[in-house]
């Protein structure tokens, strides 16, 4: 009787695999073949199969990065079992460093935690990503198995539009970056449940919702159901998520990509919903909820993921010198228009957006701290990806020693100065005026006793030696003949004159000569819009006007709203001044 030779044990170093006969006899399955560490492999990263039909989040389109460690920049990539493997190539190292410096690292951490354990795992150390997971020309987003749904040119250009229903938004009181991944997901899904209960006819409203836990109740605030249930056109592009009413073409919101911190789908009971957290001047930080037709929610999430990937590749091609974390920033559209906001307790940026605080050496600091030390402000350009408004050092023209100590700013004409807001160190402006022979009245803001407009253009004119606009006198004389011009008026006095939606008036700034403010009432909320840019030009985001009267008549006669910072102001009834 012949004895069968013993079956050889499977060696992972063998070139051939076990035959089907050997597999059946052994009763065990060979381990899965490990991916090649070659950096040239650009094959798509397959998502976990069990999660294909389940609701997902935007984060599930990104690689697993929970083991990312930044403590050892020189660390190499580890193999699947921890053995040192082939070091990442230079291109990967630079991409990983750019990822770390860009401020996107907190957004990409804890990705794919909702998916199962069947997908590939990649260990990342030293800020370097594995070759198959990342290359500069590759993809950092786990594409769907069928690939992206739309051509890149379309997402980078006009965008992709979906017809959905806007269900409202819920205020988020904490930064999403301060929360872990599971809590972020719970926040968005709890916001979806709150809106479903509040809006009649919403999908998933019939199910019983568990009481909101105490931690979530402290994170979520009030709901805003102003446009709840309205059919809208959602346009997804690399620049923004645009929400426009389908019938009247009114823009409900326009959230720049850098202001979006998290996006997620619903749970199995609310699978047709998409929620994302964004910041805007109207709702501050809020979770916006969209109801999609059946089967469309996954496509919307996938398109948002594609837009994020393309946006990050744009950032890699044009990285800024300095980057600020995206969740602290709200979008800035580069418009010369901006809303005049009431001065808050802690001073804010020249272009006023919630959550921004001026750095040391700004206009406000130097006014309030007479004789304070002069800090050095770095020179930087605005980020094309994160939209971060960064200070650019500007100096008084007569202070030669300060210019030698500080970095020279990039050449910036007057128009770019307004689009790229700058800080001016005005500590020695009074000395410069006295050296020039002009005494000038003392600044009322030095002791904080006199109120002032937050958008005070005077320091910019002094530091840049810009003469007053030559047409300011003629403009003032022309406005005196307009019944809706009230001269110098404070914010509260102007708001007291507004009674109905559509009421408006024009007033002169109490602290900035030559600056005029349009005050109007829209949806019960007063709006204050600046009309003159630093060059003395009356303009909106899209048009220039000969005068303030021309701007008012143009929008009244054509029944066109003025759009600023994502909100509208309609000019319907002028408020005449009292004679």
UniProtKB/Swiss-Prot annotation:
UniProt modification remark: Phosphorylated in response to FLT4 signaling. Tyrosine phosphorylated by ligand-activated PDGFRB. May be tyrosine phosphorylated by activated PTK2/FAK1. Tyrosine phosphorylated by TEK/TIE2. Tyrosine phosphorylated by activated PTK2B/PYK2. Dephosphorylation by PTPN2 may regulate interaction with GRB2. Phosphorylated by activated epidermal growth factor receptor. Phosphorylated in response to KIT signaling. Isoform p47Shc and isoform p52Shc are phosphorylated on tyrosine residues of the Pro-rich domain.
Entry GO terms, CC: cytosol; focal adhesion; mitochondrial matrix; plasma membrane
GO molecular function, one term: insulin-like growth factor receptor binding
Tissue expression as described in the entry: Widely expressed. Expressed in neural stem cells but absent in mature neurons.
Annotated PID domain residues: 156-339
Span of domain SH2: 484-575
Residues with PTM Phosphoserine: 36, 139, 449
Subunit record text: Interacts with CPNE3; this interaction may mediate the binding of CPNE3 with ERBB2. Interacts with the NPXY motif of tyrosine-phosphorylated IGF1R and INSR in vitro via the PID domain. Once activated, binds to GRB2. Interacts with tyrosine-phosphorylated DDR2 and CD3T. Interacts with the N-terminal region of APS. Interacts with GRB7 and KIT. Interacts with PTK2/FAK1. Interacts with phosphorylated LRP1 and IRS4. Interacts with FLT4 (tyrosine-phosphorylated). Interacts with PDGFRB (tyrosine-phosphorylated). Interacts with ERBB4. Interacts with TEK/TIE2 (tyrosine-phosphorylated).
Protein name: SHC-transforming protein 1
The species this protein was found in: Mus musculus
Gene label: Shc1
């Amino acid at each position: 009787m012949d004895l069968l030779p013993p079956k050889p044990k499977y060696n992972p170093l063998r070139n051939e695999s076990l035959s089907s006969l050997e597999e059946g006899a052994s009763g065990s399955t060979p381990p899965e073949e490990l991916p090649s560490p070659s950096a040239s492999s650009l094959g798509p990263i397959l998502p976990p199969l069990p999660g294909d039909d389940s609701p997902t989040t935007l984060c599930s389109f990104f690689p697993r990065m929970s083991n990312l460690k930044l403590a050892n920049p020189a660390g190499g990539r580890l193999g699947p079992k921890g053995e040192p493997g082939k070091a990442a190539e230079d291109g990967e190292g630079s991409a990983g460093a750019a990822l770390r410096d860009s401020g996107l690292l907190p957004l990409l951490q804890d990705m794919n935690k909702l998916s199962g354990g069947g997908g590939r795992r990649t260990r990342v150390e030293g800020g370097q990503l594995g070759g198959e997971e990342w290359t500069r020309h590759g993809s950092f987003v786990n594409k769907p198995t069928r690939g992206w749904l739309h051509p890149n040119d379309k997402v980078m250009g006009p965008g992709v539009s979906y017809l959905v229903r806007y269900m409202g938004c819920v205020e988020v009181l904490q930064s999403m970056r301060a929360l872990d991944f599971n809590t972020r997901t719970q926040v968005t899904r709890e916001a979806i449940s709150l809106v479903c209960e509040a809006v009649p006819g919403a999908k998933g409203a019939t199910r019983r919702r568990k009481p909101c836990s105490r931690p979530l109740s402290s994170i979520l605030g009030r709901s805003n159901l102003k446009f709840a249930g309205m059919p809208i056109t959602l346009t997804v592009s690399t620049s923004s998520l645009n929400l426009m009413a389908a019938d009247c073409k009114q823009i409900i919101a326009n959230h720049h990509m850098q202001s979006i911190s998290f996006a997620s789908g619903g749970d199995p009971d609310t699978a047709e919903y998409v929620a994302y957290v964004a910041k805007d001047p109207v709702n501050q930080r809020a979770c916006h909820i969209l109801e999609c037709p059946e089967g469309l929610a996954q496509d919307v999430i996938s398109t948002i993921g594609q837009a994020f990937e393309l946006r990050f590749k744009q950032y890699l091609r044009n990285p800024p010198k300095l980057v600020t974390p995206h969740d602290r920033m709200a979008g800035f559209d580069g418009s010369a228009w901006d809303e005049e906001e009431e001065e808050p307790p802690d001073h804010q940026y020249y272009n006023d957006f919630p959550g921004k605080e001026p750095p040391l050496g700004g206009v406000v600091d130097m006014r309030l701290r007479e004789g304070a030390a002069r800090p050095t402000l770095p020179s930087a350009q605005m980020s094309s990806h994160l939209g971060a408004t960064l200070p650019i050092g500007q100096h008084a023209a007569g202070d030669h020693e300060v210019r030698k100590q500080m970095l020279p700013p990039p050449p910036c004409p007057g128009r770019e100065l307004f689009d790229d807001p700058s800080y001016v160190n005005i500590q020695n402006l009074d000395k410069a005026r006295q050296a020039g022979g002009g005494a000038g009245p003392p600044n009322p803001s030095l002791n904080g006793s006199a109120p002032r407009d937050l958008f005070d253009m005077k320091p910019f004119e002094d530091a840049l030696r810009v003469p007053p606009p030559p047409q300011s006198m003629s403009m003032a004389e022309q406005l005196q003949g307009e019944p809706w011009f009230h001269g110098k008026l404070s914010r509260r006095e102007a708001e007291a004159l507004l009674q109905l939606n559509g009421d408006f008036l024009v007033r002169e700034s109490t602290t900035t000569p030559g600056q005029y403010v349009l005050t109007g009432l829209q949806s019960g909320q007063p709006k204050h819009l600046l009309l003159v840019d630093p060059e003395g030009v009356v303009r909106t985001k899209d048009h220039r006007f000969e005068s303030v009267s021309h701007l008012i008549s143009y929008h009244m006669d054509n029944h066109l709203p003025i759009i600023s910072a994502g909100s509208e102001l309609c000019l319907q009834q002028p408020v005449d001044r009292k004679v």
